Amino acid sequence: LFEDEEVAKEINDKFIAIKVDREERPDVDAVYMKVCQRMNGHGGWPLSVFMTPDQIPFYAGTYFPKESKHGLPGIKQVIGYLAETYHNDPKQIEDVTESVKKSLNQVIFKKGEERVTKEAVDQAFHELGKTFDTLHGGFEGAPKFPAPHNLMFLLRYYQQTGKLMARQMVEKTLNSMAKGGLYDHIGFGFTRYSTDEEWLVPHFEKMLYDQALLLIAYTEAYQLTGNEFYKTISEQVIEFVNREMRSPEGAFYSAIDADSEGKEGAYYVWGKGEVERILGDELAELYTTTYNITTEGNFEGKNIPNLINTHFDTVA
């Protein structure tokens, strides 16, 4: 439905849409899944939750067809009804939100008075250590997400405790992501996640929130380490976002689709012959050697430029 222009227009005309990746933010997913279960008696995905500006849910549901059918309300009808009710019958919305708050107060909305303990922070560090990929960086196996919030936590943990392992996990991950195919070495910017453990083959979609959070992670790492590589990546991400994701009105697009020319990633992959025709023999030799571009390719007969097997001291 996100790709349906008619539905997208309905949503954008009547609501502010926020898309959350439940694989990257299972904590957010868990909260609103409880909302859906409490309101409907069941949950599932895809999950849609409609909220007031102060973030109190007043409607939740899972799958909606485009038009109403087989007893299921269509997403267009749901959007229209909720928008009309919100504007014309605010008392009904208020009654629902009050009921939701009372029902969920104990499990979601109640603010805890206890501070996060040192033991809890240490435990979080140890849990990340258990899942850390010492060979390629990152956490757990494929598909592998950047999870910049983990890296920012580890940077702060290192600053407070001096535990070198925390810093090493961050640096290994940042280096591997920026050298791999997860990063666009031509147009810059990070793709959404890697389909393999070594960050080579990405899902080619580029998300605005990934650029923002990874920019924070790389700039904070630069501040801590003084590593110019992190500064370069940060500057390139800013350049990419301003060039490709800023709208003419001055706002930002939320994502760039993975598909082009009828298939995923076609825009981002290269044949060795293409590189040679564009750059000429001398420059092409340097580029293909540096970015591991071969005749056989590393992705469906084409190449995802990467620096995985390249040592920086040989590039300059």
What are these regions (language model features)?
Residues 1-316:
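Replace the tail clause
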